[in-house]
């Protein structure tokens, strides 16, 4: 199944305006990958920003902030990209083969590991959730997030999940999606 059909499923579930843009020229091993991603955002989403936000977009130490919608950026050794949505969200992409059992054991409870469809889903799910939620709690760490309520949407080759935490967080939509493409795992978590 194509990545486009997986995105259509996410659009129909949460946000028709959701966009995912990835490119292997934006992988983390490319020296200017971060600038290239932001250039693409600027070229294709200019209308979403006011003048000051456009100027800040070129500051690699700032997260992109738009007047109209939200962006999230991710990259790994094979590709990089960004997402856009009307809803606050976090995006992560990882090479499946690089997610180790050790990292899962350090960041996920035994109960989470037993419930997850694939152990590697826990890492990208928590990363996507952390990106979406960390701006509301400065003391938030990955281990504070618990991935729950896994569902398989096999006809779309997508899994969904929700997050819980012992810390008080504003979850709102609280809907995450994970899918794979080649050796890459993608997560989009809507706060």
Where are these regions (language model features)?
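Core catalytic alpha/beta fold that binds nucleotide/phospho-ligands
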Residues: 1-191
């Amino acid at each position: 199944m194509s990545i486009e059909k997986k995105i259509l499923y996410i659009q129909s579930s949460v946000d028709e305006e959701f966009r995912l843009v990835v490119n292997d020229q934006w992988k983390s091993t490319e020296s200017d990958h971060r600038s290239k991603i932001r250039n693409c955002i600027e070229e294709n989403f200019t209308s979403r920003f006011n003048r000051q936000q456009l100027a800040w977009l070129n500051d690699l130490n700032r997260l992109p902030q738009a007047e109209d919608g939200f962006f999230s950026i991710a990259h790994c050794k094979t590709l990089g990209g960004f997402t856009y949505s009307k809803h606050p969200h976090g995006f992560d992409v990882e090479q499946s083969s690089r997610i180790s059992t050790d990292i899962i054991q350090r960041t996920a409870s035994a109960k989470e590991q037993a419930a997850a469809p694939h152990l590697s889903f826990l890492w990208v799910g928590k990363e996507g959730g952390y990106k979406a939620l960390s701006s509301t709690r400065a003391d938030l760490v990955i281990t504070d997030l618990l991935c729950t309520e896994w569902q398989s949407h096999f006809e779309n080759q997508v899994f969904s999940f929700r997050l819980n935490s012992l810390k008080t967080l504003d979850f709102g939509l609280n809907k995450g999606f994970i899918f794979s493409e080649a050796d890459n795992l993608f997560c989009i978590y809507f706060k």
